[in-house]
Amino acid sequence: MDTRLLDILVCPLCKGPLEHDKKKQELICKVDKLAYPIRDGIPIMWADQARDLQTPAAG
């Protein structure tokens, strides 16, 4: 993911900063506790596509 893009992207809900999780290919909003997926190098910034970080992973 291009670092210049990361500098301008914000959470669509709170407008806060995002952190890039390279391993999981996600953009993380720590305020809303959501992880937005990155698919084929494109961040998917729809709230309904975000993973809730407060929900335990199935396993």
Curated annotation (Swiss-Prot):
SUPFAM superfamilies: Trm112p-like. It holds the Pfam family Trm112p. Gene3D superfamilies: 2.20.25.10. InterPro entries: Trm112-like. GO terms for cellular component: cytosol. Belongs to the UPF0434 family. This is UPF0434 protein HEAR2489. The lineage of its organism: Bacteria, Pseudomonadati, Pseudomonadota, Betaproteobacteria, Burkholderiales.
